[in-house]
Amino acid sequence: MQRQLMDELIAWKSRANRKPLLLKGARQTGKTWLLNEFAGQQYQNVIRFDFMLEPGARSLFDGSLDSKRIISQIELLRGQTITPTDTLIIFDEIQEAPRGITSLKYFNELAPEYHIVAAGSYMGLALRRENESFPVGKIDQLPMRPMGFVEFVRAVDGDPLADAILAADMDLLANVSEKLERLLKEYLVVGGMPEVVSAFAASHDLIEARRLQQQIIEAYESDFGKHAPARIVERMRLVWKSLPGQLAKENKKFVYGALRPGARARDFEESLQWLMDYGIVHKVPRVSALRAPLTSYEDLSGFKLFCIDTGILGALSGLSPAIVLNGPAVFTEFKGSLTEQYVAQELLLQGKTPAYWSSSSGNAETDFAIDHAGTVLPLEVKAAENLKAKSLRIACEKFKLERCVRTSLAAYRDEGTLVNIPLWEIGQIDKLA
């Protein structure tokens, strides 16, 4: 498999003002694999600590966090001399050694010549638990997410089609639209968790893919009880299990009352924040106006809550993997929730911070909106064949926007104000909008 984040890691290595790098993301997203690949391709030597498998190694950060002392300790522990430019030091599962996260600040300030990458999950939770502070401004950070559609295509179908998607060559891609639709149907069910994609690429067995997804869900749910305060664990489960139902509503706004009778926001805020810190849900806020920057218009009372991955969402919902054989049904099932989940994932992978807008009267809503080229770009997701974009036109007129995007199974079409981008190409929105 290939991950697009590899290019970011290579760029980090050659950066003159390089800082220690923190690769953060939920479990099972491929952080360890990617760092091992990066080390093997780019460095003569690698020294790796996994603080979950080697709890004794956490003593590296006992006492002084002086960088030279830590390097000397590493050399003694591993029996190797570290040459700064030739050696990559990997601190894996760094959340198990919160003072190790703090130590990155001092590596940046006192020993920037060393190439250090840390990887972990739920780090904010670990730091709060140990009363440590996050080294803001002292480290470089990269988010690790599940594989996107183009990475899935590369793993399952090979480089030529994946490269054509990245190039946004719409004339070339128009000739293989049926194949792209088939691959997208598979992606909605298989998702982008690397272990699941790898197994599917080898066997094309959807039942095995679902079995692996269930294992991942069980691992996530097991972590709830291991790391979160006992008082919120059951509430976390309620929020997590509610995702399919919340997204299957016509109005996908998250409703606390759907969790249990009489549920209120203040009862679930901590559990929701924990799930977000863990990286397995993502909040898309409502904005009161489609004006840049969107963060200035956030309405804190309204949001949609998306899952980490389309495949995981499908497994949570109990959706039969065989749905990929049933024409376009996978795109419209549960009122298009898998399709909207997919678009949210693709936007996040492109570094976007999606929001959504709905009018105060409720007569118009955009599924998403992103900051784009100094203005705002509203998006409507069309899972069905009905391509009418009334809400988009209302939004564009109300906020005097010159451009809006509809994404659907229809062919690419630029009509000036409205551009239709095929669902399988929405990851290239910057090139096409």
PLM regions: where:
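Pre-Walker A adenine-sensing motif
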Residues: 1-16
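Conserved lysine of the Walker
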Residues: 31
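Hydrophobic positions on the alpha1 helix immediately C-terminal to the Walker A/P-loop
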Residues: 34, 38
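Short glycine-rich substrate-engagement loop in P-loop NTPases that contacts/grips substrate
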Residues: 53-85
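Structural recognition of the conserved hydrophobic beta-strand(s) that form the central parallel beta-sheet
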Residues: 90, 115-121, 143
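Conserved catalytic/switch belt of AAA+ P-loop NTPases
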Residues: 101-117, 124
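Interdomain motor-coupling "hinge/lid" segment immediately C-terminal to the ATP-binding subdomain
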Residues: 129-248
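Accessory nucleic acid-recognition modules appended to NTPase machines
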Residues: 198-371
